[in-house]
Amino acid sequence: MSRGGSAGGGQSSLGYLFGGNEAPKPAAKPAPAAAPAPAPAPAPAAAVAAPAEKPSPAKADATKQIPAGIQGSRSNNNYHRADGQNTGNFLTDRPSTKVHAAPGGGSSLGYLFGGN
């Protein structure tokens, strides 16, 4: 058997994809279209009333348009800021681990390194 050659066997079942050796079936002739039904007569103009215009609802206060949970004074800042009773060191009351001195400056670790 050569490379890319057929090993024989039955017909491909992929004829529907690649166009089998069958001749296409002729399309059935559509039945002649029946004459369209006559359109109903339009209703008299007096029976059709123009819809009454509804007054537009009053504009709501702009401060009421802010979604719940967003303070109006900070509406231009999308980042969450924790402010409330559960902020700070309320759990452990430990001092912060934040660096309070500039690099090379004063250090609170003098007891380790023999500070002045």
UniProtKB/Swiss-Prot annotation:
GO CC, any one term: cortical microtubule, transverse to long axis
PANTHER family on file: PROTEIN SPIRAL1-LIKE 1, SPR1
InterPro entries named among the record's database cross-references: SPR1/2/3/4/5
Name under which the protein is recorded: Protein SPIRAL1-like 1
Record's compositionally biased regions (Pro residues): 27-43
Compositionally biased residues, Polar residues: 72-90
Keywords, comma-separated and alphabetical: Microtubule
Native organism: Oryza sativa subsp. japonica
Assigned protein family: Belongs to the SPIRAL1 family.
Amino acid composition bias (Low complexity), ranges on this chain: 44-60
Keyword Transmembrane helix recorded: no
Bias-annotated ranges (Gly residues): 1-12, 103-116
Lineage: Eukaryota, Viridiplantae, Streptophyta, Embryophyta, Tracheophyta
A GO BP entry: cortical microtubule organization
Protein role: Acts in maintaining the cortical microtubules organization essential for anisotropic cell growth.
Residue ranges of the region described as Disordered: 1-116
Domain of life of the organism encoding this protein: Eukaryota
